[in-house]
């Protein structure tokens, strides 16, 4: 095995023939030899294990997930300005949040009236965005005034649509441990 920058490398032929530990071929294309056993779940636990030189079980996934402080504060400020949004977010469950974050393409924003507001595919990053006039044209005016307490105005629908678009632009779960 050839050691470069503290990592073990071997050629493809030797790795396929299960001779990676005795490979001395420097003229062939080299591939990093992975360590044996199950990989650790996160880089933090891997670094701790290398420092302590002992077996360590990763417990990072057991720690509760807290939303980012700035984004959470922005959400609170926005919902205080729009009480309708506050009621929508109070009744969402962890399962709903998890489903919408895992598969945003299949989700449409559903409100108390049972109507759905179409997702702009610009949120998902691959098509021209819906304009607010398009969204308001898709809302049936007869549904807006069915119930006084439950109905939204077009401006409130547009606010909710913009907020949903804002939330999806903030979605970046790559940094979650």
Curated annotation (Swiss-Prot):
Location of this chain's protein in the cell: Nucleus
DNA-binding region: 1-40
Residues where Zn(2+) binds: 11, 14, 23, 25
Keywords, comma-separated and alphabetical: Copper, DNA-binding, Metal-binding, Nucleus, Transcription, Transcription regulation, Zinc
GO molecular function terms listed in the Swiss-Prot or TrEMBL record: copper ion binding; DNA-binding transcription activator activity, RNA polymerase II-specific; RNA polymerase II cis-regulatory region sequence-specific DNA binding
GO biological process annotation, one example: positive regulation of transcription by RNA polymerase II
Nuclease listed as a keyword: no
Keyword Zinc: yes
GO cellular component assignments: chromatin; cytosol; nucleus
PROSITE patterns from the UniProt entry: COPPER_FIST_1 (PS01119), COPPER_FIST_2 (PS50073)
Main location: nucleus
One Pfam family it belongs to: Copper-fist
Stored PANTHER family: TRANSCRIPTIONAL ACTIVATOR HAA1-RELATED (PTHR28088:SF5)
Official protein name in the record: Copper-binding regulatory protein cuf2
Organism the protein comes from: Schizosaccharomyces pombe (strain 972 / ATCC 24843) (Fission yeast)
Lineage: Eukaryota, Fungi, Dikarya, Ascomycota, Taphrinomycotina
């Amino acid at each position: 095995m050839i050691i470069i920058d503290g990592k073990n490398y071997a050629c493809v032929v030797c790795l396929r023939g299960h001779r990676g530990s005795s490979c001395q071929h420097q003229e062939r294309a080299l591939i990093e030899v992975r360590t044996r056993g199950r990989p650790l779940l996160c880089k933090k636990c891997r670094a701790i294990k290398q420092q302590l030189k002992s077996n360590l079980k990763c417990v990072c996934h057991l720690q509760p997930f807290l939303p980012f402080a700035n984004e959470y504060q922005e959400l609170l400020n926005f919902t205080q300005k729009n009480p309708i949004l506050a009621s929508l977010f109070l009744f969402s469950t962890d399962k709903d949040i998890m489903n919408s974050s895992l598969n945003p393409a299949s989700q449409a924003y559903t409100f108390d009236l049972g109507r759905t507001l179409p997702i702009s595919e610009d949120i998902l990053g691959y098509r021209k965005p819906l304009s607010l006039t398009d969204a308001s044209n898709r809302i049936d005016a007869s549904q807006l005034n069915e119930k006084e307490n439950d109905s939204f105005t077009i401006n409130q629908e547009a606010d909710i649509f913009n907020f949903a678009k804002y939330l999806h632009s903030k979605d970046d779960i790559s940094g979650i441990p």
